[in-house]
């Protein structure tokens, strides 16, 4: 997949669901994985020719694992000329040491999103972009069917009224295979998660 195709997929999702308006300040959640780096690259590319002017701010929630190195992500954001914030937390200690959770992912996700949303508001952003793609939509829907007995998945665009924050998912029309191909072609600095629960 080339950059032009990436921009095309991303722009179509943004236009179809009215994800970006004039003057938006969009935080992009960066895990260091292939999906979030692709999203950041796509949005930066779209900034050059999208009819609505918007700003970006990359942000990573550091869960507190000692072996996480974000230097490559810092350099990547610097190359793209996007401000980058690392939010340091003790979430790993709370989940694994204090609470000793047998199923840590759910609590970690809640705490991570809570910390992220608060920091985003502090930065003055009005939207947060997540890098969920088409495969994530299908997987979430199937998990919902298996565990809840209903078809349910996340929306392309969601307004969080308590936070006065809008969540957008611009990679919705892309397959994971497309993302992998793009990351490999452009040699993005993917950072492996140090989390012991991350298969």
Feature names for model-found ranges:
Residues 1-141, 147-150, 155-156, 177-185:
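ATP-dependent adenylation/nucleotidyltransferase module used to activate substrates
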Residues 63-64, 173, 196:
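Short, surface-exposed acidic/glycine-rich loop or hinge patches that mediate macromolecular interfaces
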Residues 153-178:
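Short, flexible loop segments at boundaries between secondary-structure elements
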Residues 148, 156-158, 194-199:
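Short, acidic/turn-prone active-site loops that include or flank metal/cofactor-
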């Amino acid at each position: 997949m080339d950059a032009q195709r990436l921009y095309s997929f991303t722009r179509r999702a943004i236009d179809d669901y009215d994800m970006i308006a004039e003057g938006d300040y969009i935080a992009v959640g960066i895990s260091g994985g292939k999906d979030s780096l692709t999203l950041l690259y796509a949005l930066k590319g779209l900034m050059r020719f999208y009819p609505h002017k918007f700003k970006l701010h990359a942000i990573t929630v550091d869960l507190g694992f000692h072996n996480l190195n974000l230097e490559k992500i810092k350099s990547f954001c610097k190359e793209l000329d996007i401000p980058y914030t690392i939010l340091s937390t003790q979430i790993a200690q709370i989940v694994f040491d204090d609470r000793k959770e047998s199923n840590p992912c759910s609590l970690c996700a809640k705490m991570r999103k809570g910390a992220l949303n608060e920091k985003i508001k502090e930065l003055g952003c009005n939207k947060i972009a997540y890098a969920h793609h088409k495969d994530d939509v299908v997987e979430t829907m199937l998990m919902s069917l298996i565990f809840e007995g209903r078809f349910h998945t996340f929306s392309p665009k969601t307004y969080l009224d308590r936070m006065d924050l809008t969540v957008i998912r611009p990679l919705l029309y892309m397959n994971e295979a497309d993302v992998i191909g793009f990351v490999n072609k452009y040699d993005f600095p993917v950072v492996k998660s140090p989390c012991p629960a991350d298969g």
